[in-house]
């Protein structure tokens, strides 16, 4: 039986991590603080990124938080909450601006942690020192978008930073004992299965605490749609995606927490792949295939 499970999952789920650490139901509340992105300053940003207004765009942070909390209190009166600054690059500002966004939320009842999604090129020394201070006062996770280790793909998708910058950011965060979660994307244009597995092998050697695995999806009004229309690059089928994800899980240390294993595209904007709209079917099929293969996270680590 896989060590890190309470429900027969064969990978280390975020649900397991939260239940064993906090002993109660934990909700992650996604917040939009209105941050921009350095990669959009002088260009279009990453080619798969949709530039429309994000969820809760323009709504103050306290209202955003209460909207979710009020919907959960009746069923889970003892629940705890993690604030997730998700939209944009959430350290792309001076420290005083960051404090104005983060500090009021820290004071709310039953808030036990803070997740900050950002980029490795938006972590200067002042920001890093402030994050260290936050980490001493709450359970802090910093999420970094890597997507791929391959330079050719990085240039194609206009990621806007180098692998060396990413490594340096991980080192600086870990020097401050800040937990790091890394985002990767499977199915990026022209990447092979071997390339996707090599991204996981690289991450498995780093001092990271979690990972989010996404499937590339193509949305309306994004530059990647133009690339898809002109090159017709291969979009992974559900079966191909599941096969790759399971192989990736087998190459990951069991203690690395899997925060996400598929995506949540906006239905009205999605062009491809439409199978992503059936999220729970994808998750169920991953579980079934892992049982069929007698697979589990870390199985192939020597």
Stretch-by-stretch model annotation:
Residues 46, 106-111, 198-213, 282-297:
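Structural recognition of alpha->loop->beta junctions
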Residues 1-82:
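N-terminal [4Fe-4S]-dependent radical SAM core
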Residues 2-16, 22-27, 210, 218-302:
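Auxiliary Fe-S-binding modules of radical SAM enzymes
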Residues 65-70, 99-103, 128-132, 166-170, ...:
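Generic structural signal for well-ordered alpha-helices
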Residues 164-223, 239-262:
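Conserved C-terminal portion of the radical SAM core fold
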Residues 52-68, 72-95, 110-123, 139-165, ...:
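Core AdoMet radical
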Residues 72-76, 102-109, 129-139, 171-175, ...:
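Acidic (Asp/Glu)-rich catalytic clusters
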Residues 95-103, 124-135, 157, 196:
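Distinct, well-ordered alpha-helical segments
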């Amino acid at each position: 039986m896989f060590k890190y499970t309470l429900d027969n999952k064969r990978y280390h789920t975020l649900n397991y991590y939260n239940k064993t650490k906090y002993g109660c139901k934990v909700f992650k509340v996604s917040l939009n603080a209105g941050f921009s992105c350095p990669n959009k300053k002088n260009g279009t940003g990453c080619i798969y990124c949709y530039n429309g207004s994000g969820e809760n765009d323009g709504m103050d942070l306290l209202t955003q938080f209460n909207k979710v909390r009020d919907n959960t209190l009746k069923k889970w009166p003892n629940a705890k909450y993690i604030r997730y600054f998700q939209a944009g690059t959430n350290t792309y500002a001076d420290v005083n601006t960051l404090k104005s966004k983060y500090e009021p939320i820290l004071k709310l009842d039953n808030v036990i942690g803070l997740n900050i999604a950002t980029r490795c090129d938006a972590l200067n020394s002042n920001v890093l020192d402030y994050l260290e201070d936050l980490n001493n006062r709450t359970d802090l996770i910093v999420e970094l978008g890597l997507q791929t280790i391959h330079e050719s793909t990085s240039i194609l998708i206009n990621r806007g930073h180098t692998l060396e910058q990413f490594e340096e950011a991980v080192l600086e965060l870990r020097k401050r004992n800040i937990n790091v979660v890394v985002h990767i994307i499977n199915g990026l244009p022209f990447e092979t299965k071997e390339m996707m597995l090599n991204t996981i092998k690289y991450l498995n050697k780093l001092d990271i605490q979690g990972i989010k695995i996404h499937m590339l999806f193509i949305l309306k009004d994004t530059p990647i749609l133009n690339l898809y229309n002109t090159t017709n690059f291969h979009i992974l089928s559900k079966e191909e995606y599941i096969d790759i994800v399971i192989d990736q899980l087998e190459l990951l240390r069991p203690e690395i927490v899997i925060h996400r294993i598929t995506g949540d595209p906006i239905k009205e904007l999605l062009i491809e792949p439409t199978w992503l709209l059936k999220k729970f079917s994808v998750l169920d099929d991953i579980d079934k295939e892992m049982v069929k293969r007698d697979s589990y996270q870390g199985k192939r680590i020597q």
